[in-house]
C-alpha cells in the first residue's frame, strides 16, 4: 500500500490508474479503524480494480461541544489494517491541505431536509461538515464507486442525495453493519465504554429488534400500527437498561420522513448515550 498526504500525489496515482483503464473504489474514514471499516474495503474490492482509502479527522463535522482533540488517532495500526486488507492507496491529508483558507472561509455543501432531523438535530452542522468533506474527497479521488457503512444510515442517505442532486458519476455502495456477538454495532465510539457500560449497550439494538418484530406482526395481521407509541415503548426499554435515549423514530427508508401505514420500506433510527459514548444504530424493516 502506498500512503500519500499531498493532493498532487493522490491525483497523479489515480491518473496513472485511469490511463491503464482501471476502475477506482473509495473508502473515506476518520481513522481509528475496526472490522466495520475493513468490511468496507473488502466490499470495495468487489466493485473496482483499485481501492483508495482516506484517513482525515474532519474538523467541520465536529460541534462546539465535541472535542476533536480527543478523537482517537491510531495511524500506525490503521495503516497496518488497511495494508492487510489489500488497500492500494491511502490518502492522509492534514487540515491545512483540505481547508487551506480555514473553516470560516470554506465553501460548504448542505443537503436540505434529509439532514435536518435525528443526528442533524442533535448535532447541528454535522451533516454540512460530512457533505462538504465527502464532496471534496470525491472531487479529489473521482472514484467510480464509494463504500459507506449502514450503521450511519442517515449519513448514507445524505451522501446518496448529494450525489444525485449534484449529478456526480459515482455509485454509492451501502455496506451492512458489522456487530459484536452481543449485537452491539462496531463503532470507534465503543472505545469509550467501560466494561459495565459495554454489558448494557446491546439494549439499544435489542430494542430496535423488538420494535421491528412488533411492526412486522402488526402488518401481517393488517392491524393499525402505532409507530409513535411503539417507539416510545422501545425508548423506555433502552432507558430502563441504563442508557439515555437521544432519539428513536420509525421512518420511511428513503426520505426519512415519519412512517405512515402506507409505507412498506421502513427504517428505525436511534441514538442513545451510554456513559461518555453516544451510540447510534438502525434497523431496516421491509414489509413488501
From Swiss-Prot:
This chain's function reads: Catalyzes the condensation of pantoate with beta-alanine in an ATP-dependent reaction via a pantoyl-adenylate intermediate.
**Protein's recorded name:** Pantothenate synthetase
Q: Where in the cell is it found?
A: Cytoplasm
Stated EC number for the protein is: 6.3.2.1
Q: In which pathway does it act?
A: Cofactor biosynthesis; (R)-pantothenate biosynthesis; (R)-pantothenate from (R)-pantoate and beta-alanine: step 1/1
The positions annotated for binding ATP are 30-37, 149-152, 178, 186-189
Q: Which organism is it from?
A: Colwellia psychrerythraea (strain 34H / ATCC BAA-681)
Q: Name one GO biological process term.
A: pantothenate biosynthetic process
Source species taxonomy: Bacteria, Pseudomonadati, Pseudomonadota, Gammaproteobacteria, Alteromonadales
Please list the residues that make up the active site. 37
Annotated positions binding beta-alanine: 61
